[in-house]
Amino acid sequence: MRAENVQLSRLFEGWDTYQISLVDAVEPLSRENLVWKANPNLRSAGEIAAHISEGRIDWFNRMGAPWSVQLIEQLKGYGSLDSIAEDAKELVKWLKLSWGMVKSNLDAWTTSDLWETYRHPYQGAVYAVSRQWTIWRVVAHDLHHGGELAVMLGLQGIPVPELGDLGGHLNMPPLAEA
């Protein structure tokens, strides 16, 4: 088999429709839906949505990804995205902005770019972290917290067919030929 240099947006196909599921889940929510907590120690649905956006921006900024610096600058005006956790329009705006940054990088990078590393200090050690590791970290973060969001909304009796029942999968694989 010949190794191909594939555009990352092709490799991560499906993540884009998961983003649509996140937006569709958050967009219709009221302030009451966004601030409700099942337990005082858990994040609210609004805090979860803000955390998803902030996680994307933070991790892509760590690897020096284009557009991340501009979003970090915009974030400074908020202090933290938790400040918008009660506003569905702002949450959707940041989900879309952070996804736009992710998508532009996935469109620009190919599989050969996955092995580029950056230095990341953590708990007294300095790690050589690859783009592959970081992108997988962000995918896992989106999926984990998207599931958490689905549960928080489900506990409130809010149906989330895309994010819940379909697991965020809006794109179906092609039908097999007979």
Predicted regions and their residues:
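Helix-adjacent hinge/juxtasegments
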Residues: 61-62, 67-107
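Short, contiguous alpha-helical
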Residues: 12-16, 20-26, 33-78, 120-178
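Extreme N-terminal tail/first-helix region
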Residues: 1-14
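Solvent-exposed, charged/polar functional surfaces in cytosolic regulatory/catalytic domains
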Residues: 21-24, 28, 97, 101-108, ...
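Acidic catalytic patch
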Residues: 108-124
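Short glycine/proline-rich turn/loop motifs
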Residues: 1-2, 79-84, 126-127
